[in-house]
C-alpha cells in the first residue's frame, strides 16, 4: 500500500489544517481534550463489535470485554442496576436516539412521538424513518419544552401511550426538560407510568449533570426509560461515538438471533466500530470522579466568564443552569463564520468545552463579538487595554 507523492502531500496539508483548527471548536460541543496515544498500536486491527457484547461472537476480533466495562460504568452513572439494563456503544447520538425511539415504537405501536422545537434535528428524521406520528411542541424562552402545550396536545390526541423525547441539554440553548414535571403532568391526565415512554437525549449534558451539585432529574432513578450520551463531546474521541442505555426487560422484546455471527443482536447498525469501545474505556479508566468534577467545573466557569464579559458590554448573553452553552444575539456573518459559531434564527452560541481551559483562548472571540454587537463599548475595553 503506497501513496503517490502528490497524495502524501495532500494528506500532510490536511494534517496541518487539522492541527491548526484542533482547538478552534467553540460553536460545537466536541472536546479536543484527549490523548489516546496508548491505543495507536490497535489501528492495524479490524476490530468489529457486531452484535451483543453479552454473547460470544464467532467474529474473534471484537472488544466486547471493554464494551461491557463501559456499559457497566454508565449504568452506575445513570442509576440503574447493571443487570437490569442493556445498551451498547453506538456511532453517535443520532443512532442512540433512533434505537430508543424504535424500542419505544415496538413497545407502543400506536403511540405518537412528542418532542420540543428545540430538539436535535435528528428526531425529525427518526420520526420519518420509523413512520411514527409525531408532534413538535413549542418551547419556552429558555429552550425547555412548553409543558402545558405538551399536556394539551397529548389530551387532544387522546394518546394513552405517548412517547416523550426529553432534552437533557438542548442543542442550541442547553435546556433541560423537567422529567419530574412531565411525569406529574401526565398523571393528571390519568396515565399510569407504565403506559408511556420517556427517552432522555443527554448527548452533552449526560457527562455534566452526574458531576454537579443538586442536578435536576436526568436518570433512570428519576423515571427515564432510555438515555443517550455522545462519546466525542464531553468525553472526547477522535471518532464520533456514543452510548445508548435502556431497561433490559424492554430491550428483550426486540432481540433477534443472527446465524451469520452465531450471536444475538439488538443494535441498529450491525457492524460497529470496536475501536470506539477502547477509546471510551480508556477515558473512563483514566479519569476519577474528582477528575470529571474538575473538568465540568472548568467548563461551567469558562461559560460564566463568557456570559459576564458579554453582559458587561451590554449584550444579552445567558446560559441555563448547569449548562456550558452560552446563548447571545447572532453576530454578523463574517464573525460567526470566522469563529465557526453555530447559529439558529436570531441567536448564536458558544460551547465551552474542556480544551478551552483558559480565558485567553476565549478572549479573541469575545472581543470580536463585542466589537460586532456593541461597537461603542468595544472601543477601549478590549482585554489587555487600559
From Swiss-Prot:
GO molecular function: histidine decarboxylase activity; pyridoxal phosphate binding
Positions that bind substrate: 120
GO biological process terms, semicolon-separated: carboxylic acid metabolic process
Catalytic activity: L-histidine + H(+) = histamine + CO2
Domain of life the protein comes from: Bacteria
Name of the top EC class for this enzyme: lyase
TM spans (from-to): none
PROSITE patterns (alphabetical): DDC_GAD_HDC_YDC (PS00392)
InterPro entries reported for this sequence: Group_II_Decarboxylase, Hist_deCOase_bac, PyrdxlP-dep_de-COase, PyrdxlP-dep_Trfase, PyrdxlP-dep_Trfase_major, Pyridoxal-P_BS
Pfam families registered for this protein in UniProt: Pyridoxal_deC
Listed cofactors: pyridoxal 5'-phosphate
Alphabetical UniProt keywords: Decarboxylase, Lyase, Pyridoxal phosphate
The protein's Enzyme Commission number: 4.1.1.22
N6-(pyridoxal phosphate)lysine carried by residues: 233
Name this protein carries in UniProt: Histidine decarboxylase
Species per Swiss-Prot/TrEMBL record: Vibrio campbellii (strain ATCC BAA-1116)
Gene: hdc
Amino acid at each position: 500500500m503506497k501513496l503517490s507523492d502528490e497524495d502524501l502531500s495532500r494528506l500532510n496539508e490536511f494534517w496541518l489544517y487539522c492541527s491548526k483548527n484542533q482547538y478552534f471548536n467553540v460553536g460545537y460541543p466536541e472536546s479536543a481534550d484527549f490523548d489516546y496515544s496508548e491505543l495507536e498500536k490497535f489501528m492495524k486491527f479490524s476490530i468489529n463489535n457486531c452484535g451483543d457484547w453479552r454473547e460470544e461472537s464467532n467474529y474473534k476480533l471484537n472488544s466486547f470485554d471493554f464494551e461491557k466495562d463501559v456499559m457497566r460504568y454508565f449504568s452506575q452513572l445513570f442509576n440503574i442496576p447493571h443487570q437490569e439494563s442493556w445498551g451498547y456503544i453506538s456511532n453517535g447520538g443520532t443512532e442512540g436516539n433512533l434505537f430508543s425511539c424504535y424500542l419505544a415504537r415496538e413497545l407502543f405501536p400506536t403511540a405518537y412521538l412528542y418532542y420540543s422545537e428545540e430538539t436535535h434535528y435528528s428526531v425529525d428524521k427518526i420520526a420519518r424513518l420509523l413512520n411514527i406520528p409525531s408532534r413538535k411542541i413549542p418551547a419556552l424562552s429558555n429552550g425547555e419544552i412548553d409543558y402545558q402545550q405538551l399536556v394539551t396536545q397529548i389530551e387532544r390526541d387522546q394518546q394513552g401511550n405517548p412517547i416523550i423525547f426529553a432534552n437533557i441539554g438542548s442543542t442550541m440553548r442547553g435546556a433541560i426538560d423537567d422529567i419530574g414535571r412531565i411525569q406529574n403532568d401526565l398523571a393528571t391526565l390519568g396515565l399510569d407510568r407504565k403506559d408511556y415512554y420517556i427517552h432522555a437525549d443527554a448527548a452533552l449534558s449526560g457527562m455534566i449533570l452526574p458531576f454537579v451539585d443538586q442536578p435536576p432529574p436526568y436518570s433512570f432513578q428519576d423515571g427515564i426509560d432510555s438515555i443517550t450520551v455522545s462519546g466525542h463531546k464531553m468525553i472526547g474521541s477522535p471518532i464520533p461515538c456514543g452510548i445508548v442505555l435502556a431497561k433490559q426487560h424492554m430491550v428483550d422484546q426486540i432481540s433477534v438471533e443472527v446465524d451469520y455471527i452465531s450471536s444475538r443482536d439488538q443494535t441498529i447498525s450491525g457492524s460497529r466500530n470496536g475501536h470506539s469501545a477502547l477509546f471510551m474505556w480508556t477515558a473512563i479508566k483514566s479519569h476519577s470522579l474528582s477528575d470529571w468534577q474538575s473538568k465540568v467545573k472548568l467548563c461551567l466557569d469558562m461559560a460564566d466568564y463568557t456570559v459576564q464579559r458579554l453582559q458587561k458590554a451590554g449584550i444579552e448573553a445567558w446560559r441555563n443552569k448547569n449548562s456550558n452553552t452560552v446563548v447571545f444575539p447572532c453576530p454578523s456573518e463574517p464573525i460567526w463564520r470566522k469563529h465557526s459559531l453555530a447559529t439558529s434564527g436570531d441567536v448564536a452560541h458558544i460551547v465551552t468545552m474542556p480544551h478551552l481551559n483558559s480565558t485567553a483562548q476565549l478572549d479573541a472571540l469575545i472581543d470580536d463579538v463585542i466589537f460586532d454587537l456593541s461597537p461603542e463599548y468595544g472601543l477601549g475595553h478590549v482585554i489587555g487595554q487600559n
